[in-house]
Amino acid sequence: MKRSAVTFLIICSVFALAPRQASAQGGTWADRGYINVGWGVESGSSAQSSTVSKPIYGETGTLVSTATFTSGSLFDVGVGVRVFKNLTLGVAYHQEQNDTDGQLTGNIPSPVFFNRPRTLSSTVSGLDRKEMATHVNIGWVVPIGQKFDVMVYGGPSFFRLNQDSVTDVTLAEQGGNFTTVTAAPTITEVKKSVTGYNVGADATYIVWSNDSIRLGLGGFFRFAKASTEVQMLGTTTQPTDVGGSQYGLGVRLRF
């Protein structure tokens, strides 16, 4: 949370200083618009845990499902136009995907012995999480020389989250004396839509140009965030954040 606040304050400061810096550089952005395509990584973490208690063989059993999703690869594309001087209006889309292994643990009562629960420990492999977002951005371009410029931007973000979640567990007895128990998880793809925000910066260096277009290479940083909930065991829901710190490189087209 502290890192998010610091990032937000830094970007806001850049926004405040950008017009003054552009004036100091003595340039108004001359291009009519841009198309950016990039690849990178989203750095973020979402740890989820759900605990349920249920009657089993006349006693109370406990099941715990946990999963932690971390950084994933990212694809990003954006387009925008100059609306006034160095002010731009644009829209961007990013897609990020990663997977993880979840864990199922618990204490399961015995059908034979009272107050002698069996310990359950099982791995749930290949839980997928896919994040998509559309960002509407207002930006300000700061030209630095003839070939290099930096654009700072921000605006609302509209996220779509598709995530695999363990929503139920079927238990099965093993062994002649019921000493062990196994679990077969029910995996459900949970889908959520949520609105958040984004702030960021994009740097471009032009490597080739003619009378119509300019081509370049660039890098970007974006911090995007929204919060929602996902269903886990039974009817329980757990909070999760989407977005995070995003970094990447790509190609730039100016027209």
Summary of predicted features, one role per range:
Residues 20-84, 89, 254:
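Short glycine/proline- and aromatic-enriched beta-strand/turn motifs that initiate or cap beta-hairpins
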Residues 35-43, 91-95, 152-158, 203, ...:
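Transmembrane beta-barrel strands of outer-membrane/channel proteins
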Residues 77, 136-138, 152, 199-203, ...:
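Membrane-embedded beta-strands of outer-membrane beta-barrel proteins
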